[in-house]
Design a protein with these regions (language model features):
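Cap/lid segment of the alpha/beta-hydrolase catalytic domain
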Residues: 184-276, 280-283, 326-331
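Primarily recognizes the serine-hydrolase "nucleophile elbow" in alpha/beta-hydrolase
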Residues: 276-335
């Protein structure tokens, strides 16, 4: 049935990929982003004319020598405006040493994101956390690995819950010769994209390639902890109802009956789940739990960043195409990229209710995502972008890697070392902050995984 004009989206709709995230192909919202960027840089306050609007669209995308669409320099290679200072405390004090960072600035930033973006967790590791093997360990000679499955269970004041995880361990690994591991926060169908029986192999979770290069490969499904969809009950309780409303069953029911402005949202729940999987990996013979990398794509990339910020046991944090509220800097005009308002409106369950205070304030935020990325220091951080993923704002993701790097300098380390031009498939791997811009769209591919492993080979071995 054709909708009335009053019911149609004001700025158009966006095509969504396999994980539900808007792809680089956008209509009205993209154009609105271009206009917003032009107004910011040209200080235009009046409505733009149709002619100027058309010029904006034409200039928004350019084509390189290889015929690949890349962000236009005028809009997407600009510098951030009035970027909040990373190395300045809340009281204006200059943060000059690693000790200052650890005692003053890092706790301030972590508290800010907890109370204003992701929400307060009622518990970290539950006292009754249990690991129950699912069946026997399976010898998989076809991929030269042992597959282990587990049910991770726990309970709270109001109920009990659990979720499954899996790891493939190279048969050559042993307690005396443990191997590093990659843990994927899978935000797509496990059967289609991360089949643990390995009957269906995809680039999204290339177990065979990880094993070949000497890494264990672990995975869990984010929605086993918290559903990834909006529920009407959210408007009353501040976080999406998980499983059976109203909190009579399911994950959230373990600790709270009512939600508040700062109650944790789904991203924090998923990140919490990654930490619980790491708890289990610490008990698995043959895995070096001091060298575990957490990886996420899209909303999973946002989750990986928060997991790395809240759990310092993760040695490497890889955020792939994480976009707005992930690795993308907000204080810069990046045409076609997502906004905070869009994330809050489309996925309110990801965040705490307090995060709505920043709707429409992207360019004047009192913080930005380089603060979040810096919480990983002095450990390893990798941010990955895709040239055709306009929604994630590749240039903004790159800028976060650049502007978070001073936190690593405090420890006497290099952050992002730009030892080449910002170009497609020219990775930066020298410092402890890595980055690459892949050719292609919003996805997690073998190219991305290969660069993550190259970086880990260099810094994690």
């Amino acid at each position: 049935m054709r909708r009335k004009a009053s019911e149609r989206p004001l700025y158009g709709t966006r095509r969504r990929g396999a994980d539900g995230y808007p792809t680089g192909d956008a209509s009205g919202d993209a154009c609105f982003g271009i206009i917003r960027g032009m107004k910011m840089h040209l200080s235009v306050k009046a409505p733009l004319s149709a002619a100027v609007f058309l010029v904006a669209i034409i200039k928004a995308v350019s084509v390189d020598a290889a015929g690949v669409s890349v962000p236009n320099t005028m809009y997407d290679h600009s510098d951030p405006v009035d970027l909040p200072k990373l190395l300045e405390g809340r009281d204006g004090r200059r943060i000059a040493t690693a000790e200052d960072w650890e005692k003053v600035r890092r706790p301030e930033i972590l508290d800010f994101f907890t109370r204003n973006v992701y929400g307060i967790r009622p518990v970290e590791r539950p006292n009754d956390l249990r690991f129950e093997s699912i069946g026997e360990d399976l010898d998989m000679p076809g991929i030269d690995a042992i597959r282990k499955r587990v049910r991770i269970s726990f309970s709270g004041a109001h109920g009990a819950w659990g979720f499954d995880a899996c790891v493939f361990v190279p048969r050559s690994a042993s307690p005396g010769k443990p191997v590093p591991a990659f843990l994927l926060i899978c935000n797509r169908s496990m059967a289609r994209f991360a089949d643990i029986d390995r009957k269906r192999r995809t680039e999204f979770f290339p177990v065979e390639e990880m094993l070949r290069r000497g890494y264990a490969a672990a995975v869990f499904r984010n929605t086993d902890l918290a559903k990834d969809d909006y529920h009407p009950y959210f408007s009353a309780n501040g976080v999406a109802v998980i499983q059976d409303p109203p909190f009579t069953n399911g994950f959230y029911a373990c600790w709270a009956k009512e939600r508040t402005e700062t109650s944790w949202g789904a991203i924090s729940v998923w990140a919490w789940g990654a930490s619980r999987v790491l708890d289990w990996l610490e008990t698995v013979p043959g895995i070096d739990s001091r060298r575990v990398a957490v990886v996420g794509h899209s909303r999973g990339g946002k989750t990986a960043l928060w997991a790395g910020a809240t759990d310092r046991r993760f040695a490497l944090v890889c955020a792939n195409d994480s976009g707005c509220c992930g690795a993308k800097l907000n204080h810069v005009a990046v045409s076609m990229s997502e906004t905070i308002r869009q994330d809050n409106n489309n996925n309110p369950h990801w965040f705490c209710r307090a995060f709505r205070q920043f709707n429409g304030r992207d360019f004047v935020l009192p913080y930005d995502q380089h603060w979040l990325a810096a919480l990983v220091a002095p450990r390893l951080l990798y941010i990955a972008s895709a040239s055709g993923d306009a929604g994630a704002g590749p240039w903004g993701e790159f800028l976060t890697a650049r502007h978070a790097s001073p936190a690593w300098t405090l420890y006497g380390n290099d952050g992002l070392v730009e030892d080449g031009p910002y170009r497609i498939e020219v990775p930066f791997h020298v410092g402890r902050v890595g980055y690459h811009l892949r050719k292609g769209d919003h996805d997690l591919t073998l190219y991305d995984w290969s660069r993550f492993m190259d970086f880990a080979d260099r810094h994690l071995r």
